[in-house]
């Protein structure tokens, strides 16, 4: 009799960078290859993965092995602990043992930004991702729309890979709006979406985060809700107010109870089956907080129909996982 070990939802993959391609001034695509990437689950949509990056001066990653590798990693002294950051699996080609990840170039203010600027073929890292051998829900996906209603997908450049992955998997009869705020007009990338999903790129051109996205989301939400007959726009002529530290909500708390400077803004509620509009928002936490407040407070959209994720916070370092 053979004892078979249970398969965990996630596992570590040892990978090497096969190719690095600059997509635009702000985006670079890294293609990874590895002997076990045929077991990397191709879940699509906004599937999150973890990249363990090299320590300064290294071109490879050396992580603890075994099912408890994460606990072992957390127990390491800080100077020996490889930075781990969260990204989206942009494309998976198991038959070629390949995985694409799109990185945003944000200068060199943190380990992930520095690595993105310096990465080159031949470098080695480790990736924690979904194991195709696991038959249940892997986790790490936050796009959970109702079966009816239109979609509103909005975010800044850090959400472009996830929203692009979502759009590629939408049914052909999907309807809605996609709003993507990016630094530069040259950052407008090819994006595949169903005919009924309108995609709008919003270059900041040196402006502040949210300068274009906040107003665009307000207009799109008003139009989509009016077309569907849902929602009650309580402040039809007002623009969403600019947030200040201390605003926000998470975990069902009132809008003003969470400080995004100290708390991760992240909530993916169970969606009501009859929602006229489903909103998926991701990007800079202060901007996302404002967008969520507008949809729920001003547009009277059921808060269960708004998934919102503060991917990062302006002026604060990206936390280690």
Positions of the model-derived regions?
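Extended, composition-driven regions rather than compact fold-specific motifs
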Residues: 1-321
């Amino acid at each position: 009799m053979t004892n078979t070990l249970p398969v965990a939802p996630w596992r570590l993959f040892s990978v090497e960078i096969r190719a690095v391609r600059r997509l635009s001034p702000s985006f670079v695509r890294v293609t990874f290859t590895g002997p076990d990437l045929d077991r990397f689950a191709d879940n699509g949509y906004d599937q999150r993965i973890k990249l363990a990056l090299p320590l300064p001066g290294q071109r490879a990653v050396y992580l603890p092995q075994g099912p408890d590798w994460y606990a072992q990693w957390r127990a390491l002294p800080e100077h020996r602990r490889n930075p781990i950051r969260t990204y989206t699996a942009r494309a998976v080609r198991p038959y070629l043992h390949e995985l694409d990840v799109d990185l945003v170039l944000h200068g060199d203010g943190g380990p992930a930004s520095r690595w993105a600027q310096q990465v080159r073929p031949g470098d080695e890292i480790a990736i924690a991702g979904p194991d195709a051998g696991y038959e249940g829900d892997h986790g790490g996906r936050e796009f959970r729309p109702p079966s009816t209603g239109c979609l509103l997908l909005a975010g800044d450049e850090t959400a472009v890979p996830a929203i692009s992955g979502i759009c590629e998997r939408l049914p052909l009869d999907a309807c809605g709006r996609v709003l993507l705020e990016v630094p530069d007009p040259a950052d407008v990338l090819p994006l595949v979406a169903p005919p009924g999903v309108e995609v709008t790129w919003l270059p900041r051109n040196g402006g502040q985060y949210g300068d274009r996205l906040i107003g665009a989301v307000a207009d799109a939400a008003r139009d989509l809700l009016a077309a569907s007959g849902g929602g009650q726009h309580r402040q039809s002529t007002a623009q969403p107010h600019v947030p200040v530290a201390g605003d926000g909500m998470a975990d069902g708390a009132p809008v003003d109870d969470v400080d995004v400077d100290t708390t991760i803004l992240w909530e993916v509620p169970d969606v009501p089956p009859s929602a006229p509009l489903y909103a998926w928002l991701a990007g800079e936490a202060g901007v996302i907080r404002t967008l969520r407040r507008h949809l729920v407070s001003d547009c009277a959209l059921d808060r269960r129909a708004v998934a919102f994720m503060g991917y990062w916070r302006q002026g604060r370092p990206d936390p280690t996982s």
